[in-house]
Amino acid sequence: MGSLQKILPEAVSEAVEEAFLGKLQAKIFAGANNLVLAIRAVQAAYGDAGVETIRRAFAESWAETGKEMAKESADNPLRSLCSTLEQTCMGSHEWIKLEDSATRQAYRFTRCMWAEAFRELNAEDIGFWVLCQGDASLASSFNPLIGFSRTKTLMMGDDCCDHVCYLKTQ
């Protein structure tokens, strides 16, 4: 999965999709580069305390995002969360859905343009805490009954991200 075809109002040719994805990748790289430059500048001026402040701000932002997403949630909160995340990842990520049940959704992400950009910038650490660490707080703030687990990330050099979202047992 990951093709733009599912979210476009009408089908486009493979060449058009590739051109669009190339532009998307360039924009992701530019955004990641600006973020890395800003964070490194804060680190140089304010040390680790400055970076920790930024890290906390991103964690809070992911939690707020989860709460906002929940406002538009359907009946099944787990399926609603995962459907929204899939829509968000279209184009910039490639994945296989390994499990699709009412209580558990499992994925194997094999491509992430964000991980590619942060790796190229030698800033996987920043990419990890800006993006990857937000996954769990986004899920739990969307609905406290939703859990999230992952043992691998493309951002940190693994061959995939193994995301699992599940309903916690009560």
Regions found by a protein language model. Give the residues of each.
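N-terminal accessory segment detector
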Residues: 1-104, 113-131, 145-160, 167-170
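A helicase ATPase "motif cassette" and its flanking acidic/Ser/Thr-rich regulatory loops
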Residues: 107
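A contiguous catalytic/ligand-binding core that recognizes phosphate-bearing ligands
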Residues: 140
